[in-house]
């Protein structure tokens, strides 16, 4: 079977590099092809009768559209494997090593500005140690540097585009009204238009999060 890879339009360079690695490792170019473009290209691929199935990672909205396209296309029934709208979580109890846990939490939640499907979104902490971990998380987060990710000693970069930033700011605005307390990175707001300050919200329930937030936002429960 042949595979066509289509990365998100804003991550075309990464898509090219990943496919290049596969080709260099011995996968025939005829077996793995790369297509770049926006949602028009995605719609064409998922509606094409020659496509037997789709594997997709992204938003629930996009997955629903892909599923509809596959169902409406001509030919036999086609398969869809989708990973969407995830809220990756970590559970911390009193047996955990605080320094190691907090380092792992910050790296998972905030490196790449949280723009990874595997990024940590929710941190569950045992009640008895919640205040201790909250204070240590606040202290440790301030040690990370925000700026141009191409520069040395910079840990956290910008959001990929304005639409993503606007969605994140809307989520932050809503949570500010209901969060019990907040941790915010203390960097100056002069880095550029697409930077969002890493932020941690303590919330009462996972039900306060109604969608995946693809950015530097961590929810502490």
Please describe what each predicted stretch is.
Residues 6, 35-37, 57:
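Structural motif
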Residues 33-52:
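A structured beta-alpha segment of the ubiquitous adenosine-cofactor-binding alpha/beta core
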Residues 10-13, 39-41, 60-61:
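Short alpha-helical
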Residues 33-37, 92, 220-221:
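Short acidic-hydrophobic, aromatic-tinged amphipathic segments that line or gate anion-handling sites
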Residues 21-26, 47-48, 53, 60-206:
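ALDH superfamily catalytic-core signature
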Residues 1-29, 99, 216:
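Conserved small-residue-rich beta-alpha loop and adjacent elements
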Residues 192-197, 211-218:
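Conserved glycine-rich beta-strand-loop-beta hairpin in the small C-terminal domain of fold type I
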